[in-house]
């Protein structure tokens, strides 16, 4: 039986993650106290159905190490992993403002402000975040985008082969926090300064022709390919389920999109499990 423990900051998307897991066939339980987790797993052990349980700030034990003790015990007979959802303070403030919901810690005796409650929760969940097998940052993601990200990562972990996630992004939108490797390609020739090319993206043939006409672009692509070809066997031996490679340019529209697509297709042709995401491009087109 497989158990996924879902945790994270209030407002970061735990309920979204649980809905996705339910769609994937998991038996889901929301806000189960840690003290009841072992007994609950024992009660469903015979069903052979995968299970997902959410744990949040309201049902955490006072001693954070108790969570790890329970998970370590369950790992002896089950496939256990933890999914932790995070988001920036600005994103959480905006979400609470839009939904007008009350933060769980705002109901405590000290009655902290929303900003103070978010900071306090971040500190309290710190030890849990460090134990996470899968960390997702939902900042600036829509419900649909977050659902697709969760689905992609969970389905990737269910496969035994390492999944290579190639992700393009724009630095002006911020760094992706869940990347294992980040390549800054802003030094490459920029199609943005060509009026005829500016409206296009790195997926369009004229952009490909422009970039492939510069030797430094092709050299960088080959060096990245060689780097991962050499080290991928070691990464696979390290019991990883996925590897996220983020490639960024200024706006995430031309150079990073081209390289991300090319690298993803290259490793897919070699027989690797590959997932492609053009995060900034998706934002611009939505």
UniProtKB/Swiss-Prot annotation:
Assigned keywords, A-Z: ATP-binding, GTP-binding, Nucleotide-binding
Coiled coil: none
Disulfide bonds: none
Keyword Nucleotide-binding: yes
InterPro entries: P-loop_NTPase, RapZ-like, RapZ-like_N, RapZ_C
UniProt GO molecular function: ATP binding; GTP binding; molecular adaptor activity
Binding positions (ATP): 8-15
Source species, domain of life: Bacteria
Residues holding GTP: 56-59
Family: Belongs to the RapZ-like family.
Function summary: Displays ATPase and GTPase activities.
HAMAP family: RapZ_like
Name of the protein in question: Nucleotide-binding protein VC_2532
Protein's organism: Vibrio cholerae serotype O1 (strain ATCC 39315 / El Tor Inaba N16961)
